[in-house]
Every structure is written in structure tokens, then in C-alpha cells.
Amino acid sequence: MAFRQHQLPEESSKECESNPRYRAVFISDLHLGTPGCQAAALLEFLRHHTCDSLYLVGDIVDGWQLRRRWFWPQLHNDVVQKLLRQARKGCRIVFVPGNHDEFARAFEGHSFGGIQVVNEAVHTTADGRSLWVIHGDYFDGVIQCAKWLAYLGDNLYEFSLKLNRYLNSLRARAGLPYWSLSAYLKGKVKKALNYVTDFEEAVAAEALRRGHQGVVCGHIHRAEMREIGGVLYCNDGDWVESCTALVEHRDGRLELVHWHKQLAGGFTAPVGQEVSA
């Protein structure tokens, strides 16, 4: 896949110094290559959240949608260039492909522009906890057993996102904050809630079986951090609806960052859900 070369403006040293440097940042489900990707918000997040290690936890590029219709605006190219520049500056970037960018799984063990490609990873926090890092689609029965249904669901989801963008354009004109229609609908549908619960419990159980204290995943576009059966389950959310990420502070504390809420509040200090050892 060829990307146009475009030089991003360098962040000022003053801006970089004013932001804390995190030990690790986890993001997933960017879905670059789709109109739903909130690339502008993501770029702003990356500028304010420098880190030692950055984990790209799957569905970074949406190969499913790009095969149907090419969509690659300059902002999406800027995100790729930003990631490559972070790698050049010494940030360790690990890419764990998901089902929408499963083509990258064939390149496990390779490095492109300083970005390592692995099908799963293990991250050890500063306080010694072992976190299993996976996208999570292997625990999705629809993906594994009825991929045609997954493609159908993807089309319906894309339609809901188009409606979501229209509604939020009206809300913006009225001075109202961003609101996710699809997230609201998922929260109201009992079957969707059962699916999420089953997914979370299955992922946590496998992490425990493998001897890890926690797991970081994506896939279901639902940011969460809670204990499940003695395992810390972390889902870093997505950059289509919620604009969320998981960060590790220098002392090993984990925090879910809700970037939309921070922007709405003027971005003064990190806020989110934290879990301490």
C-alpha cells in the first residue's frame, strides 16, 4: 500500500516538555481508510501523549473497507507519518494486527519503518504485572465461524456511523457535544450487552490460563477496565466512536483516557479511570 509523502510540522519542544511522558500507550480500532476514523482527534491525542512504548492493538487500517472503496484523505496519511516519526525518535512501536488488517499477520516478526509486527505481545508494567496484548477477534464467534455475517454486520455498522456523523453535525451547529448513536444503541440492546460480557469473560479466562495478571485488547469498540476472575481486563476502546486509549504511568498505574471528554473540558489535566497495583 503506497502512501503519499507529507511532512508534518514538528511539535515545539515547549509543547513536548509540558506533557507527561508515559511508559506505555495502547490504542486500537483506528480504522484508517474509513470516513468514520476520527484522525484529527487521534493526531491531537498523539501530540499530547508521548511514550516509551506504543502498542497498536489491531484494526489500525481497515482493509475490509478499502477493498470495497478507496478512501485515504491527507489526515489519515498524517497519522501514519506521525507514527513513523515517533518510531524514528526512539518510541518502541508494536503492531498487533486485527481482523480488519489481518493481511499484516503474514508479516509477523518483521519491522517496517521501526514498527514491529507481532500477532500477540506481552507487556510488563513498571510494577511487575504481565499484560497479554491481543486484538481479540479470535474470541469473536461471528468472526471465526460466520465471516460472511461479520461482513454484513460491518456494512450495517458503517451505515450507523454515517447516520451518527449527520446527527453530530447537527449537534455541533446547536453547540452540543459529541454523542455516539451506535454506542447508545449497543448499550440498549440486551443481546449486544450479552455479547460484550461473553467476550470479556472469555478473553480474561484465557489470559488467566496463560499465567498473565491482565489483558489488553480492542475489537468490540467498548473501552473498559475491570477485574474479571482475578484478571485485570483492559479494552482500550476505539477511534471511531469513543476516542479512548489506555496509558501506563511511570509508576505502573493504568488509566483509561477518554479523549473527547478531555477536549470538551479544555484539556487541562489527565482525567480517566485508574487502577493501581
Residue ranges and their predicted role:
Residues 2-3, 17-23, 34-126:
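Core catalytic region of metal-dependent phosphoesterases/phosphodiesterases
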Residues 3-4, 12, 238-277:
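Long, positively charged, glycine-interspersed low-complexity recognition regions
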Residues 23-31, 65-69, 184-191:
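Short, basic, glycine/proline-bearing loop/turn elements
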Residues 24-26, 54-56, 132, 216:
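Residue-level marker for buried hydrophobic side chains located in beta-strands
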Residues 29, 58-59, 98, 135, ...:
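Active-site glycine-centered loops adjacent to acidic/histidine catalytic or metal-binding residues
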Residues 65-67, 105-107, 143-144, 225-227, ...:
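Short glycine-/acidic-enriched loop or helix-start segments at secondary-structure transitions
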Residues 113-120, 132, 137, 141-151, ...:
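Conserved beta-sheet core of the metallophosphoesterase superfamily
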Residues 134-199:
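Active-site-proximal loop/helix segment associated with metal-binding centers of metalloenzymes
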